[in-house]
Design a protein with these regions (language model features):
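AAA+ P-loop NTPase catalytic core and its hallmark functional loops
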Residues: 1-135
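Conserved AAA+ ATPase small/helical "lid" subdomain
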Residues: 120-187
């Protein structure tokens, strides 16, 4: 569930319910994309949570903490987690203090070049890309270990003006292009 493209209406919408005495109440319907309306277990990854607008963050925080969204409660066997970048990366990912205080934050690290090559061998990455990784191991450095962004042209660095950088995702995309390069028309 990509938070960067969602607003509150993509999470829940109100449904005004009437009862026999003329009174009413509001029930909130969830977006079917979430899958919680089926009363079956779901695995829900809330991607780019830190970039979501505040209303979306708050609605999804209830899902993360109380396992409820709109008028629905998640199936007890459901798994929900969120991803975001580090605030220090300077790409707009910020967790409000009230959310950060309630969530368990697990920081994952970039793979080493050895780990990525092992993964690549087992996942059909083009040998040319694997060789490039072996010869350019500094592409796997963490920006926090690079004091001067000009020392490493391959990694994202918040103090750099570079628009392009190497990530495991971009390496996998390069591999996909390498596999079809013979089929691409040069014209």
């Amino acid at each position: 569930f990509d938070c960067t493209t969602k607003d509150l209406g993509d999470i829940t919408i109100p449904d005004i319910m009437r009862v026999e005495d003329g009174s009413g109440f509001v029930r909130y319907l969830t977006n079917e994309e979430l899958g919680v309306h089926n009363d079956k277990p779901v695995i829900l990854m809330i991607d780019e949570y830190g970039k979501a607008n505040p209303a979306v963050k708050n609605a999804l925080l209830r899902l993360l903490l109380e396992r409820k969204i709109g008028s629905y409660t998640l199936h007890p066997d459901s798994i929900v987690f969120a991803t975001t970048n580090l605030g220090a990366e300077g790409v707009g990912d910020l967790l409000p203090a009230h959310a950060r205080n309630r969530l368990t934050v697990i920081e994952s690290s970039k793979p080493t070049w050895e780990q990525w090559i092992e993964w690549g061998i087992n996942n059909g990455i083009d040998p040319t890309v694997l060789g490039w990784c072996r010869n350019n191991d500094k592409a796997f450095a963490d920006f926090r270990d690079v004091e001067d962004p000009d020392e490493n042209d391959y990694v994202y660095h918040p103090r750099s003006t570079r628009a392009a950088f190497v990530t495991p995702r971009s390496l996998e995309a390069a591999s996909d292009w390498m596999k079809v390069r013979d089929k691409v028309n040069d014209n």
